[in-house]
Amino acid sequence: MIRRTSGFSLIELLTVVAILATLVGLLLPAVQAARESARRSSCSNNLRQIGLAAANHESARGRFPVGAESRQWDERPDFPHQFFRWSVLAHLAPYYEQEQLLRSLDLSVPLYVGLSPGDIAPQNKPLVKLTIPLFLCPSDIATAVADLFGPTNYAGCTGSGVDGGSPFETNGMYGINSRTRPRDIRDGLSKTAAFSESILGAGPKATTSPDGIEPATGYGFTFATPLTAAGCGRPFYYNFTDLRGFSWANGEYRTTLYNHARQPNGAALDCLSALMTTPDKSRMYAGYGWRTARSRHAGGAVVGMADGAVRFMADSVDPAAWEATATIAGGEAAPLP
């Protein structure tokens, strides 16, 4: 008696494998898209929480926080005022719902109490090094890019950048010693950008050539202050520190300030400069910048509006509308993107 054993033929097995491979090929992009959708939703929620903290600050103090702080240190009147440098994110510390540790920040002393980058007041040093999930977009690398500081993907909007990227007297919500009130935002809170996102830097790279430097993670440095198209078109140094977003505590264009001088995720390197030679201690070391919104999301970046709402702005947004969204009282006729 011949016994027959059941099983798969080679052709049947290969057919099943091919079907499974096809299913995986169809499902994997959907799974990846779902994960990115969740990450983008989390990123949007972070901006909502930051916007809520700004609203709570305004309710408590009658104005929104400064974008960056610059003032005389009474203990050392000869010290550059820019060394105070506390950012808008730092000034919102008492108003975050879930970040109790940040309420211990001592903002009565400068961020930098000496001339070295490591000269941070002892009471603040362990705090400014913290990596805070609220300040990080989960679509990005979400890791520190500097030894002494915790990173951030989020920045306050200084305006259109048409003033050569100056951080002073800006036409947006935030800037050095800005004290914007709701009534100052004549264009309307729902039509004015307050915060957006950027991409963290990847570490120091080239110092003299743009080769291999991605606009997403690098900068071009120029000696033109205020910034000019010619100066930013041919910077003297490229990506010289590449510390984009290196610190949520630092109020400057490399970290917690941005503007709408260029469209989101633009192909050109963002451009920075520093005011080094002025005798004016209130402005010495101030950074000028044309730094736009950037993200790891496909097709655009998330923007937090002044009323606390969030919007996804496409890379292809009309430049006039993008610029209009940045100003608080420009009276532009361009429709909201």
PLM-predicted stretches and their roles:
Residues 1-10, 71-75:
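N-terminal leader/signal peptides at the extreme start of proteins
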Residues 4-39, 43, 49:
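N-terminal single-pass transmembrane signal-anchor helix
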Residues 33-337:
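Internal low-complexity, small-residue/proline-rich segments
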